[in-house]
Each structure stands twice: as structure tokens, then as C-alpha cells.
Amino acid sequence: MPNIKSAIKRVKTADTRNSRNASQRSAMRTAIKKFDEAAANNADNAKDLYVEASKKLDSAVSKGLIHKNNAARNKSRLAAKLAK
């Protein structure tokens, strides 16, 4: 544990951000998994789940969780699965 006051605060804020980022990342991954499952089963709600997953990916980019090219690649792959 750090002794300097500013370092103590940095540890606290890092923990807060880490937990927030982890929940965002988890929600993004869950949305992608739900879409993959629906697309594999040719479910009726696959289009809605695709839109939801795309929103989660865009949100992750705006929050700095993933790179914009990573999101674009994932969205492209999801769209290809939806088209099949």
C-alpha cells in the first residue's frame, strides 16, 4: 500500500475504473455471445441482438475499452454471420 496521499488516491481510482471497465467489457462480451447463439440457431431476434451487440461495441470504443478497428472488425464479423 502506498504511503503518499496522491498515490493512495490513484490506487483507489484505478480500482474503481477497473471494476467499471470490467462490467462494461463483460456486458459487451455477453451481447456478442447472445448474438452468436441466436445466429447459429437462425433465431428471429438475431437482428435485434446484432443491433444490441453493435451498440455495446461502439460504447466500448467511446469509453476507451477497445480500439475502434477492433470494434469494426467484430461488427463486420457479426454482420457476416447475420447475412448467412
UniProtKB/Swiss-Prot annotation:
Residues 1-28 are annotated as: Disordered. It holds the Pfam family Ribosomal_S20p. Coiled coil: none annotated. Keywords: Ribonucleoprotein, Ribosomal protein, RNA-binding, rRNA-binding. Gene3D superfamilies: Ribosomal protein S20. InterPro entries: Ribosomal_bS20 (IPR002583), Ribosomal_bS20_sf (IPR036510). Belongs to the bacterial ribosomal protein bS20 family. Binds directly to 16S ribosomal RNA. PANTHER family: 30S RIBOSOMAL PROTEIN S20 (PTHR33398), SMALL RIBOSOMAL SUBUNIT PROTEIN BS20C (PTHR33398:SF1). This is Small ribosomal subunit protein bS20. It comes from Listeria welshimeri serovar 6b (strain ATCC 35897 / DSM 20650 / CCUG 15529 / CIP 8149 / NCTC 11857 / SLCC 5334 / V8).
